[in-house]
Curated annotation (Swiss-Prot):
Family: Belongs to the Abd-B homeobox family.
Residues joined by cross-link Glycyl lysine isopeptide (Lys-Gly) (interchain with G-Cter in SUMO2): 82, 116, 178
Species name: Homo sapiens
Family matches, as Pfam families: DUF3528, Homeodomain
Subcellular location: Nucleus
CDD domains: homeodomain
Gene Ontology cellular-component annotations: chromatin; cytosol; nucleoplasm; nucleus
Protein name in UniProt: Homeobox protein Hox-C11
Region (Disordered): 166-237
GO MF term list: DNA-binding transcription activator activity, RNA polymerase II-specific; DNA-binding transcription factor activity, RNA polymerase II-specific; RNA polymerase II cis-regulatory region sequence-specific DNA binding; sequence-specific double-stranded DNA binding
């Protein structure tokens, strides 16, 4: 295939087109063509480059040569004065400014929020929607340096109308909120008193160890005292093991005890008549609950 090719004619058009710069390619036939071989190995080290050293024409770019290098800082963090050379993209920036105004986020205030640099540039205002920095804006920047300006009204409401947060906010709402726990209304006190009385009654039913005289003495000051007076918790006096064993033995034989037997147990166990009576009442309620639980367990019907 290569034997029929005349390398002199193959190389001559390139010499005619490119002139004297490629004159040294005259030896390409001896270097590239071997009559005894089908394949050849080109030697490009002796061949000059096809492109001239200096570019023949300047390549035009759609943007200026003074385009700054790519930076990691986003557009919202940079002042608008540094982007004056991109005139072809002004419509995009105008659309962005319009969107920011639509969202109540002027470009200058956004930059002040993010960069906290008030004097880095002049004013950059949208021509259709000029704005002025509000008086309490710089105080709100201290309160909210991350969220947009639209969220500042929540902080202003928290501080009652903007400004630096005082040491003691003079808000009437906060004062009332603070005063409510200190002086709750009478209805709340009444409900608390009722709840305390119910809890005390339940405690008396479950733990009837306190004496009747002590219980009555504890209830009388509670009734006669002022509503906002602190309630004193009555002292718990659990039964001893010996007393519980004797009471359980008597309950095993007699669920309901008469007055004579009750007085006898009170003298023997060093208890009052009321304590023995309350213990038997609570023991009967406990036995009733246990029997109901046993019935539910063995019958398998939780509605019983």
């Amino acid at each position: 295939m290569f034997n029929s090719v005349n390398l002199g004619n193959f190389c001559s058009p390139s010499r005619k087109e490119r002139g004297a710069d490629f004159g040294e390619r005259g030896s390409c036939a001896s270097n590239l063509y071997l009559p005894s071989c089908t394949y050849y190995m080109p030697e490009f080290s002796t061949v000059s480059s096809f492109l001239p050293q200096a570019p023949s024409r300047q390549i035009s770019y759609p943007y200026s040569a003074q385009v700054p290098p790519v930076r990691e800082v986003s557009y919202g963090l940079e002042p608008s004065g540094k982007w004056h050379h991109r005139n072809s993209y002004s419509s995009c920036y105008a659309a962005a400014d319009e969107l920011m105004h639509r969202e109540c986020l002027p470009p200058s205030t956004v930059t002040e929020i993010l960069m906290k640099n008030e004097g880095s540039y002049g004013g950059h205002h949208h021509p259709s929607a000029p704005h002025a920095t509000p008086a309490g804006f710089y105080s709100s920047v201290n309160k909210n340096s991350v969220l947009p300006q639209a969220f500042d009204r929540f902080f202003d409401n928290a501080y009652c109308g903007g400004g630096d947060p005082p040491a003691e906010p003079p808000c009437s709402g906060k004062g009332e909120a603070k005063g409510e726990p200190e002086a709750p209304p009478a209805s709340g006190l009444a409900s608390r008193a009722e709840a305390g009385a119910e809890a005390e009654a339940e405690e008396e039913n479950t733990n009837p160890s306190s004496s009747g005289s002590a219980h009555s003495v504890a209830k009388e000051p509670a009734k006669g005292a002022a509503p906002n007076a602190p309630r004193t918790r009555k002292k718990r006096c659990p039964y001893s093991k010996f007393q519980i064993r004797e009471l359980e033995r008597e309950f095993f034989f007699n669920v309901y005890i008469n007055k004579e037997k009750r007085l006898q147990l009170s003298r023997m166990l060093n208890l009052t008549d009321r304590q023995v009576k309350i213990w038997f009442q609570n023991r009967r309620m406990k036995e009733k609950k246990l029997s109901r639980d046993r019935l539910q367990y063995f019958s398998g019907n939780p509605l019983l």
